[in-house]
Amino acid sequence: GSVLLFGSCSILLNVFQIGYSTILIHCKSSVEIVFPSVGILFICTQAYFLWHHSKDCIQVQHNFTRCGLMLTIATNLLLWLLAVTNDTLHMEIESQLREVEQRFAGKAPSSHPHWCNETTLCTCPNTTICKVFQKGYILLYPFNTEYCLVCSSVLYVMWKNVGRRISHHHTPHTKPKFKLQGVVFGPLLGTSAVIIGACVFMMYQIQATSLVPSRQVFVIYYSYYIVLLPLMSVGAVIGTIIHALEKKELDTLKNPTRSLDVVLLMGAALGQIGMSYFSIVALVATDPRDRLNSLALSYSVLLIFQNITQNVFVIDGLHRQRLTPPGKEEDTKEEQNREANSQRRVSVLELGQEIRKASLSYIQIYSHLSWKRRVLREISFFLVLCNIILWIMPTFGAHPLFENGMERSFYGYSTWFVIVNFGLPLGVFYRMHSVGGLLEVYVTA
């Protein structure tokens, strides 16, 4: 599913890039039109291949298959590295902003001949279609890097499964189904965090992307994170302590998928941790006593701590053995009830009785769950919703680390652009992957 989602966004990104380069064909190379066209073919072919063969354990031509998969992984990593370091369009936009600032200041735009010769001559004209292509390209840019990372992960699992044989006596674990039962406070707190985060995000998008961004919107943005991140960290620490108090044994069986999940969680967290580290260095070296700088500094420190505590909680939960027997009995009872309900027509009176029975059963399940399992479910669901809003905000254009200008002025445009473009896609991928891990912890609690 994620391959198709991010693949579709990557195709749309390439379409915007082709349209943008076509409008500026007088100063753009034809390679900038051919390359995204070939990229669309590659994305479609790869998505089709992964959709139909991602779960196959190939038993023929082992060496040839491994070589092809490793070549495809290397191609995706190269495309990811190219996307991280390619700042052509962003430099053009920066050139336009500098020119506008110079005009407002009453200076001639030709005061920087290097910018005029290379970028100012190749700027987007004041047409709606060009602005649409430009804005769409910038908004969809992180999806392309995520697509490369997701495909590399799936291809690596396929590479590990080449030649793998599953014994006939092996009985695979039946994954428990997701049920919103036994949780009350987690969904309430998580929904509140999502609603407030959506309001902060809309305010940020309106004010921070203007010609002269307001400092107040950055204060609101950082304040939201400074309140939310400690709550998430405390929840993860409490969940880890409950895992330690549980009597569940650790699942020590070899599991390639779980091992990959752990590696991806730890590796993707390095993106946000790295950006936060460089941000801390820049803020401490400049003026940490300034209000906005102190908020950004607190945000970076709390983000590092939250990533570490959440990783410990999720990884510990993934290694706990599942309690299968009660789950199986509940599943069989529910299936029997569904079959019985589908065989008869429900009248208005019966519908009221069914609703009352459902509410009573929900209360019984909530009361029968042990307090440890109940708290784990509440924490897991709360963290799922928090990670969703923290995934949405940077994915759709909230990048305060790049737009507030503090770190950019310290490191320089090109250096900070590479740091952000390296860490931001990993951070977005981390939030998305954390949702999957937390849902598994919730289901198996």
Where on the chain are the PLM-derived regions?
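Extended alpha-helical "rod" scaffolds
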Residues: 310-311, 317, 361-364, 372-379, ...
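Non-transmembrane, juxtamembrane loop and terminal tail segments
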Residues: 104, 167-181, 188, 323-374
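Transmembrane alpha-helices of multi-pass eukaryotic membrane proteins
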Residues: 1-6, 27-42, 62-72, 133-148, ...
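Extracellular/lumenal N-termini and interhelical loops of multi-pass eukaryotic membrane proteins
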Residues: 76-138, 387-414, 418
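Membrane-proximal N-terminal segments immediately preceding the first transmembrane helix
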Residues: 51, 113-129, 162-177, 197-213, ...
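Membrane-embedded alpha-helical transmembrane segments of multi-pass integral membrane proteins
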Residues: 6-16, 38, 42-52, 75-82, ...
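Transmembrane-helix exit/juxtamembrane "anchor" motif
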Residues: 48-55, 151-167, 205, 235-251, ...
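Membrane-lumen (extracellular) interface motif
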Residues: 14-35, 51-62, 84-94, 197-225, ...
